[in-house]
Amino acid sequence: MASFEEAEERILDKMICMRCNARNPKRADSCRKCGYKKLRPKAKERRAA
């Protein structure tokens, strides 16, 4: 997707809050916006339309 590896890591290495869908750092244990503890890793593959 991205043109070089560093950009891809910067874009995709995130955690997503399951409650408010905020982007968080990959080392986060709770959401920065709402404090929710359940985070999922951002999807690495694009979804089919």
Curated annotation (Swiss-Prot):
Pfam families: Ribosomal_L40e (PF01020). It comes from the Archaea. Keywords: Ribonucleoprotein, Ribosomal protein. One of its GO terms (biological process) is translation. GO terms for molecular function: structural constituent of ribosome. One of its GO terms (cellular component) is ribonucleoprotein complex. NCBIfam families: PRK04136.1. Belongs to the eukaryotic ribosomal protein eL40 family. This is Large ribosomal subunit protein eL40. The gene is rpl40e.
